[in-house]
């Protein structure tokens, strides 16, 4: 199943997980040292939702991120869907 948001286009990003040792300078130590770096993925907070579309007069089942759900609450589903179609998501 795709991990891409249908409304905002958010998808997994790549980054690093750092292994750190030492005592921080805030605690009067010498400072934190990075001892290892491992590749990892940052996944978007995805969920499948049934949302009511007033223009189409039916439920739409969408796989969206939490950020997209907040956007739907703010602007309304029909505006967000129109914006997503214009951007090509």
Swiss-Prot record:
Keywords: Ribonucleoprotein, Ribosomal protein
Top-rank lineage group of the source organism: Bacteria
Ribosomal protein found in the keyword field: yes
Residues of the signal peptide: none
GO biological process: translation
GO cellular component, one term: ribonucleoprotein complex
UniProt-recorded Gene Ontology molecular function terms: structural constituent of ribosome
Positions of disulphide bridges: none
Family matches, as Pfam families: Ribosomal_L28
PANTHER family recorded: 39S RIBOSOMAL PROTEIN L28, MITOCHONDRIAL, LARGE RIBOSOMAL SUBUNIT PROTEIN BL28M
The family this protein is said to belong to: Belongs to the bacterial ribosomal protein bL28 family.
Listed name of the protein: Large ribosomal subunit protein bL28
Organism: Chlamydia muridarum (strain MoPn / Nigg)
Highest classification ranks of the organism: Bacteria, Pseudomonadati, Chlamydiota, Chlamydiia, Chlamydiales
Gene symbol of the encoding locus: rpmB
């Amino acid at each position: 199943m795709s991990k891409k948001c249908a409304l905002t286009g958010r998808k997994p990003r790549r980054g690093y997980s750092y292994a750190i040792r030492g005592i921080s300078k805030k605690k009067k130590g010498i400072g934190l040292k990075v001892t290892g770096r491992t590749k990892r993925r940052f996944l978007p907070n995805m969920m499948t939702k049934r949302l009511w579309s007033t223009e189409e007069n039916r439920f739409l089942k969408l796989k969206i991120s939490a950020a997209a759900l907040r956007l739907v609450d703010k602007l309304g589903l029909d505006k967000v869907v129109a914006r997503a179609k214009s951007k090509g998501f």
